[in-house]
Amino acid sequence: QQDYTGWMDF
């Protein structure tokens, strides 16, 4: 899943 910024949500 990705975060709101586009980075991967760890």
Swiss-Prot record:
The modification Pyrrolidone carboxylic acid is found at Q1. Transmembrane segments: none annotated. The modification Phenylalanine amide is found at F10. Keywords: Amidation, Amphibian defense peptide, Pyrrolidone carboxylic acid, Secreted, Sulfation. The keyword Manganese does not apply. GO terms for cellular component: extracellular region. InterPro entries: Gastrin/cholecystokinin_CS (IPR013152). Expressed by the skin dorsal glands. It is found in: Secreted. Its main location: secreted. One of its GO terms (biological process) is defense response. PROSITE patterns: GASTRIN. The keyword Secreted applies. It comes from the Eukaryota. The modification Sulfotyrosine is found at Y4. Belongs to the gastrin/cholecystokinin family. Induces contraction of intestinal smooth muscle in isolated guinea pig ileum. This is Caerulein. The lineage of its organism: Eukaryota, Metazoa, Chordata, Craniata, Vertebrata.
